[in-house]
Amino acid sequence: MPVYVDREAPKLWRRIYSEATLEASLLAEKWKLVLAGLVFQYIHGLAAHGVHYLHRPGPTLQDAGFFILPALGQDKAFFSETVFVTIFGSFILWTFHPFVSHSKKICTVLIWCRVFVYLAASQSLRIITFFATQLPGPNYHCREGSKLAKIPPPKNVLEVLLINFPDGVIYGCGDLIFSSHTIFTLVFVRTYQRYGTRRWIKHLAWLMAVIQSILIIASRKHYTVDIVVAWYTVNLVMFYVDSKLPEMAERSSGPSPTPLLPLSTKDSKNKSKEDHQRLLNENNVADDH
């Protein structure tokens, strides 16, 4: 096995170099869209911080989810964040898997261009809704008596532009309808549902999305309406965007690449059958000529 790994290591680096060259050419073509997507993430964060200046703490609203789900408490608020970070990190790793995997169905740059469009459309609607109506935040740091529930007017423009990072991001209030975490989660899960290849991962991803939604409500980070609105809004937005954008073409397989690890017996037989069928087709074409 060590001998095999030593022999395949140069192939791995050639694969990474080849993929990096391809992705660099795509990035040179699509860099404006990628940059716009990144800039909009900052704009979304700026808006979420800006609405905190308008937030006024008050009694927690009556909520069916709060009635059904017992509060986890402040000491267990990290549960939902742990699930979210797992989903977020796993999705990022998956989008970069073409650099090392011999199975290449997507291009990293193209998949992120599409993801940024999904996010920008959903977050634009979110900005409109949380500026239209500010609800009293249910989170512990947004309740009456908390020093973080209200923030004084900014002293200068720079204070607003810097979003009081990182506290302004972690301890925000007022940006409720609808849940930002749920936007990211559903965009990532639905994107993998469409372009991923592992069925069990798709099922697991949807399960984790449901669990995260439940944990967010149980942590009192959002009202139930914030989660419900996110679920149908993001799905409708992605459906609409997909109907307007051209379908992202799958990568052509071309010549069968050499795998990084030995193929199983079943895979080897399937590969042999494919090679044999390809050879027959080539011979038939030659005979016709």
From Swiss-Prot:
One of its GO terms (cellular component) is membrane. GO terms for molecular function: inositol phosphoceramide synthase activity; phosphotransferase activity, for other substituted phosphate groups. Its main location: membrane. GO terms for biological process: sphingolipid biosynthetic process. The keyword Ribosomal protein does not apply. Residues 266-279 have a biased composition (Basic and acidic residues). Mostly expressed in stems and flowers, and, to a lower extent, in leaves, roots and siliques. Pfam families: PAP2_C. Keywords: Lipid biosynthesis, Lipid metabolism, Membrane, Sphingolipid metabolism, Transferase, Transmembrane, Transmembrane helix. It is found in: Membrane. The keyword Lipid biosynthesis applies. It is a multi-pass membrane protein. Belongs to the sphingomyelin synthase family. PANTHER family: PHOSPHATIDYLINOSITOL:CERAMIDE INOSITOLPHOSPHOTRANSFERASE 1-RELATED, SPHINGOMYELIN SYNTHETASE. This is Phosphatidylinositol:ceramide inositolphosphotransferase 3. It comes from Arabidopsis thaliana.
